Structure formats: structure tokens, C-alpha cells
């Protein structure tokens, strides 16, 4: 009997995603990359954090283990278009840049690295900044800087003084 792995036959794929991702990582460890990709890419999800996670993981497997940057771009684009927080936007843009760089699409890669580097307070934003501006220091804009009075009051708190030791 063959089990159909489509959204019409899956019950609550959002609840199953965590288990699927754990199994996929185990398959990667066992070097069963194609099976891991099938498990993550046929997730049956259409929205939400599980959808974003599934699309990113599918793109990562496609790029890192299947050596298929075109397939990865498809997944990273879906990821990028369905997230909203800076940490996720920078992550999606970075991986789109990396996929395009591998394809030799330097202009497209730089476009995505620049997009990711707009979020300098994130890991991928910093990686992207280093890719396109290797000798230029990080400069945070005024919206990212902490108000001096707020910082001063924060460091006056007893618990902060204890932890700061």
C-alpha cells in the first residue's frame, strides 16, 4: 500500500512538521539526502512558522546536499516571501544570495546579500555584510541604537549588577 504524501491526505501537517524535521535531520546524518529532501519538501503546509521552517530546510538540503541551487532558490524564495521578522528576512535573503552566488549570478547574489545586510543585528545580516563589504565596519543606524537613559537605568538595577559582575 502506498501512502499519499499530499496536503489532501495529510492530517494536521503543522502538528507533524516537528517530527518530520527531526527524521529529516536523522536521514541527513545517515547520508540519505534525497529521502530527507522528499520528507521536508512534501510537507503539505501553506502558511505559518512550520511552512517557513519546512521551506528553509528544503532549500538548505537542496543546496547543501543535493547540489541543486535552482531548486534551493525556489524554496528560499517561498521562505522569504512568507516571513516578516528581521531574523528570518535576513536568513532568507542570505541563502538566496548564496544560492545565486553558486550559480554564478553575481548581480543577483549581491542584491540578496545587500538585502540581508540591512539587518545588521542578525547573524545572517552580519554574514552578508562581510560578504559584500569585507573591510567595512558594521554601522548601526539610529533606530538600532539603545537610548542612553534607558541603558543607564537598566544597569542600575540590582539584578543586572549581580549578573554583570
What are these regions (language model features)?
Residues 1-165:
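Extracytoplasmic and endomembrane cell-envelope/extracellular-matrix remodeling and assembly machinery
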Amino acid at each position: 500500500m502506498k501512502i499519499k504524501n499530499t496536503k489532501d491526505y495529510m492530517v494536521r501537517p503543522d502538528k507533524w512538521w516537528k517530527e518530520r524535521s527531526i527524521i529529516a535531520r536523522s536521514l541527513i546524518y545517515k547520508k540519505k539526502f534525497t529521502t530527507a529532501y522528499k520528507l521536508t519538501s512534501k510537507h503539505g503546509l501553506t502558511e505559518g512558522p512550520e511552512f517557513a521552517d519546512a521551506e528553509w530546510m528544503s532549500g538548505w538540503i537542496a543546496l547543501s546536499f543535493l547540489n541543486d541551487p535552482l531548486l534551493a532558490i525556489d524554496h528560499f524564495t517561498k521562505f522569504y516571501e512568507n516571513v516578516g521578522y528581521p531574523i528570518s528576512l535576513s536568513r532568507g535573503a542570505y541563502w538566496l544570495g548564496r544560492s545565486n552566488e553558486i550559480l554564478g549570478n553575481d548581480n543577483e547574489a549581491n542584491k540578496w546579500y545587500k538585502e540581508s545586510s540591512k539587518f545588521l543585528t542578525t547573524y545572517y545580516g552580519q554574514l552578508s555584510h562581510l560578504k559584500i563589504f569585507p573591510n567595512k565596519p558594521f554601522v548601526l543606524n539610529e533606530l538600532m541604537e539603545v537610548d542612553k537613559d534607558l541603558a543607564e537605568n537598566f544597569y542600575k538595577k540590582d539584578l543586572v549588577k549581580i549578573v554583570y559582575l
